[in-house]
Amino acid sequence: MNKTLLSTIGLCLAATAAMAQNPFVQTWFTSDPAPMVHDGTMYVYTGHDEDNADFFWMQEWRVYSTKDMVNWQDHGSPLALESFSWADDRAWASQTIERNGKFYWYICAHSKISKGMAIGVAVSDSPTGPFRDAIGKPLFENGSWDHIDPTVMIDDDGQAWLMWGNPQCYYLKLNEDMISYSGELGRLDMTEEAFGSPAMNKRERGKKYKDSYTEGPWIRKVDATKYKVDPSKAYQLLYAAGGVPEHISYSTAPHPTGPWTYAGEIMPLSDTKSFTNHCGVADYKGHSYFFYHTGKLPNGGGFGRSVAVEEFKYNADGSFPTILPTDDGVKPIATFDPYRKVEAETMAFSKGIKTEQNDEVGVYVTDIHNGDYIKLQNVAFGNKIPRVFTARVASGLRGGQIEIRLDSIHGRLLGTVNVPGTGGWEKWQTITLDLDYSTLTDLNAPSRTISGLNLPATADVYFVFTGRKGPKLFNFDWWELRAMEQINMPLFQTKYTADPSPMVVGDTLFLYTSHDASPEDIPDANEKNSAGFFMYDWLLWSTTDMVNWTEHGAVASLKEFPWRSRENGAWAIQTVERNGKYYLYAPLHGHGIGVLVADSPYGPFKDPLGEPLVWQKEHWEDIDPSVFIDDNGQAWMYWGNPHIYFIKLNEDMISTSGDIYVVNQQDGVARPVKEEGAKINLRVPWSQKATWAVQHYQEGPWFYKRNDHYYLGFASTCCPEALGYAMSDSPTGPWKEKGYIMRPTERDRGNHPGICDFQGHSYVFGQNYDLMHLETFQHHERRSVSAQEITYNADGTIQEIPYWLDQKPMKQLHWLNPYQRVEAETMNWGFGLKSAKMGIENTGVVKDMPESTGKKNMYIFDVNDGEYIRLRGVDFGKGAKAFTITAAATGTATVTLRLDSQDGPVIGTAVIKSTGSVEKYKPFSARVKNATGVHDLYICFDKTQGDVRLDWWQFK
């Protein structure tokens, strides 16, 4: 397409794109549309006019498809002249039909054999190909020019009919194999009664045509179950009529062979900028559509045509109304789902771009320049929250940007994908963008609110391409938008968490975390929006299925160590069990490492020493303790940043034995720290290959043993930090770095591993900023813990995994039983909600948190409209009948129970009313219907007023 011409009309296109849908393919000149509906999809098979052509020099056929009638996917060219050894020119009009699971594409082309036009047939197992010549020769030819524009129909009795021709209309009876025929070539009687009288005002040179039929027939049968059709008019033959310029007329008959009776015009002559026309008709999802072609693309015309479509309604007797060509086209009949992998060549409108295809990726978008764009219409965000956008791109130059905008090319910016140079136009890279929700506020109605974020239920989406003016920017293969429900989001949402420390006891996995304070929890008003660490206590969570987690609140705080020197700095801990006791090892920043002991994993934890367990007073490197008890009973503690230290623990777990050792990171060998030259540390970025034994260590060691291999997981060279690991045959080394568990990414900053086996699966835990990024991309130390399953190779090495958000949600180990009491703070997702322990107001952790809280009951508060608690994999069995939720409230709230999504089927509704006090809990019940089998459960909140607090719920 002429880029100069496109740029001159760009403003006009931008102004009208919101309305104009015709022509519905803008990337290429397309002609002779032939629709086919199959398996819920509308396919349109077209010809392809070459750019800047002075005749119908056509080399291939193309396929497009849609499920909503406005967003069309380009499937490229699965059939070309080269597919037919006997053809050499003129890939003209065609039609495809399905029979017995095969797809038959009837074409016309110029024959090398007869030197005339011929009818051929290709076959495929798929509507989009690849297609091959079914018989290796023309299906019909006799050297005449007449044999063009085939149309095909399978009648109710199974007889297939093939028709074609200009100016004579021919027909054949196809055999059931669809690639052979029986009987002689038939000819329709081209009488005035059959096809109307010639329009003499278009016949300046006399009576060249005997009647109004010209070419491009389309045969169909009226559905007698829908329309009161006269049996003598059961069959309809549409065609281009009147010579040049052409309009569309039709005739009717009681049988495909006639006799035919002229029925009138369907699409009269109009200024379509094309002197030919060619139609096809199809019913789809309760609508009727008329396809035709125009010359209305920029630089188009009689030899540069473009397919278009109009919706219409048949008359009561099945006859056609008058259909006029429009620029508006048709309205969408369905919304477009963006939460999946979408080919970039799927679009409702585009400016400037082209499509190409190759064997590696298939069809892709190319010829992208600054200011070009793709539009998708009626995109449904629904009740999901879009989180991650991924694009597959390639660039042989410097790349460019993809701006994701709503409703216009200058509309609200959702995010910008920076496309780098990839080293070649077909050297593809996958680029990921985490969406910034600060851009999603103040959107116009209709809208929905999720945790204070306004998002449109549906919108048009524009991919606007920007970069250097002049050169081609990049190629674009596919994109994917993933909602939070589709990706591996952080495990917890009621609080910011970091430094995960898993501990397995029986069938329960306990996860201890540090706690990044929210602004309201920071005592100093001047520090509430600071970017630094504000950490005062440690939290506990538990699960039995790896997807639904129960919060147990703070199990310990800095106040448990009265000898500490700081009020801030509750950094990474680890808890281990031995002989029925639970030992929590905690760094006291600048004051060594302490230990707490409890009789329960829930606490209360107490300091048995009154002083540090380990304290190297000459530096501040005593952080991030990791403790492991070996098979022989020997306990070890590793720690340190930027050096790796370890020491033996005695059996009492609260005293040490022997010297502190430090790992020489050049050779991986541990030496007593007091030895001169023991410390050798040279950290290099992960982008630089390690030449030393453990060259990328930064902090956060996680020491464990599995199948006789010792492992040291760690956070890599900052920043951003990866999850790396080293291995050894001994708990003391020598250590050898093995590579990544998870590579570093600019989407993150710090990290901290926790690794364990649980119920036959292996997991790695780490941290990120993905929860905070739902509210802001301005940096704060407000982290969140995520987890993912990992796989060990036969030699003990660990298979690398992608970034958290680039993975699917974790698999559930077993279903949740709703017929037992379930704490309200048990959830898979609850963004926007908050939690606290009963009797402890959430007005400041440092001020109000007792020194030891133990296992006290918790509640959910700060409940607002649009928020919800999601539980995954709830097994209702044969059916639930009732639901009870206990709450305390000074206001009211409606609790709607839904299955599988926020707008899923409603199974019950409970109304929480005021209990007179936020400390007075009462049960509120609802009848439940249609809750059987396994579903995700959404406990949705609406019509909330006042302070509402939730304790537990249960089905019966």
Kindly label every feature range from the protein language model:
Residues 20-909, 913-956:
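Carbohydrate-active catalytic/glycan-binding domains of CAZyme proteins
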